[in-house]
């Protein structure tokens, strides 16, 4: 479906599904949402978690009624490829921030020759980390305001410490010019803060030079459309059943209307936790959740019903 088809097609305003887009460096997540609205004509577009302006990579954008599923992806594991610049540090931990310290090439190489084993050991210990203090320059809100804005104004911020988990980690290039690694982490983990913390522990300036998000849950960057494809209007709308991990329960034709009217029906089986009710044509009718300790055919609740247009 190209751009002209989308703009001329009356389904554009009611289409539901997901867009997988490779966000470029220099654009905020909100900028990408605005671009999708303008270029493709969708009124209802959301996103499933921010990606820093200085980073690129996979963004999942729900459209239409699928914006109801935005929160589902917030707790998914995420994978990244990171490149670190030795010899320079910023207040944000990436190249977008204000420079705090910058060493010459000669100073960096001299320090690296003397301390590289200690630095390598710190990088290799990353998989053992279990907590992380959120960076002061972040999109997290304090009384409705971004921490980064308050930090820039000189407001003292209360540390926000989170539990994190490193599922996979591989250290790659390791030289005075660049350090690289691949990592898969729990939701809410800041890769640039990992670099900032290593820098603080060893007393040597480091910052992220490049960061690419390569996956969110089961979805990979190689499935995403390029930003150029978005600008050309040549972008794929992924149906929800190919994106969501929820089990499905088929509803007979005789009960479809009851579900769409928000009336619970008896189910032959109820999956663990959350699930979708679908029609015989595999159209999503409702998003449901099993009641805690539920054992009967009605022991579930509707999280969202998707009425037909």
UniProtKB/Swiss-Prot annotation:
Reactions catalysed according to its record: uridine(55) in tRNA = pseudouridine(55) in tRNA
Domain of life: Bacteria
SUPFAM superfamilies: Pseudouridine synthase
Keyword Cell wall biogenesis/degradation in annotation: no
InterPro entries: PsdUridine_synth_cat_dom_sf, PsdUridine_synth_N, tRNA_psdUridine_synth_TruB
GO MF annotations, alphabetized: pseudouridine synthase activity; RNA binding; tRNA pseudouridine(55) synthase activity
One GO-annotated biological process of the protein: tRNA pseudouridine synthesis
Residues of the active site: 52 (nucleophile)
Keywords associated with the record: Isomerase, tRNA processing
EC number: 5.4.99.25
Xref: Pfam families: TruB_N
Family note: Belongs to the pseudouridine synthase TruB family. Type 1 subfamily.
Function of the molecule: Responsible for synthesis of pseudouridine from uracil-55 in the psi GC loop of transfer RNAs.
NCBIfam families linked: TruB (TIGR00431)
Protein name: tRNA pseudouridine synthase B
Biological source species: Leptospira interrogans serogroup Icterohaemorrhagiae serovar Lai (strain 56601)
Taxonomic path: Bacteria, Pseudomonadati, Spirochaetota, Spirochaetia, Leptospirales
């Amino acid at each position: 479906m190209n751009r002209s088809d989308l703009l001329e097609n009356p389904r554009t305003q009611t289409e539901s599904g997901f867009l997988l887009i490779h966000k470029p460096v220099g654009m905020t997540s909100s900028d990408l949402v605005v671009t999708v609205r303008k270029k493709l004509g969708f009124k209802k577009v959301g996103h499933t978690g921010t990606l820093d302006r200085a980073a690129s990579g996979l963004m999942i954008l729900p459209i239409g009624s699928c914006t109801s599923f935005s929160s589902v992806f917030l707790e998914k594991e995420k994978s990244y490829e990171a490149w670190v610049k030795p010899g320079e540090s910023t207040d944000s931990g990436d190249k977008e921030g204000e420079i705090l310290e910058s060493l010459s090439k000669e100073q960096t190489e001299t320090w690296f020759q003397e301390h590289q084993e200690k630095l390598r050991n710190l990088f290799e210990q990353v998989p053992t980390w279990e907590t992380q203090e959120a960076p002061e320059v972040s999109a997290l809100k304090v009384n409705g305001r971004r921490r980064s804005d308050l930090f820039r104004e000189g407001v003292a911020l209360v540390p926000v410490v989170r539990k994190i988990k490193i599922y996979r980690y591989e250290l790659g290039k390791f030289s005075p010019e660049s350090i690289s690694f691949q990592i898969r982490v729990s939701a809410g983990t800041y890769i640039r803060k990992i670099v900032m913390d290593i820098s603080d522990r060893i007393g040597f300036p480091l910052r992220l030079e490049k960061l690419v998000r390569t996956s969110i849950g089961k979805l990979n960057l190689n499935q995403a459309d390029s930003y150029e494809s978005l600008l050309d209007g040549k972008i794929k709308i992924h149906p929800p059943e190919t994106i969501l991990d929820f089990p499905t329960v088929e509803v007979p034709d005789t009960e479809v209307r009851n579900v769409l009217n928000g009336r619970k029906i008896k189910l032959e089986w109820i999956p663990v936790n959350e699930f979708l009710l679908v029609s015989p044509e595999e159209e999503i009718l409702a998003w449901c959740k099993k009641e805690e300790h539920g054992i009967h055919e009605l022991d579930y609740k509707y999280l969202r019903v998707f009425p037909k247009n």
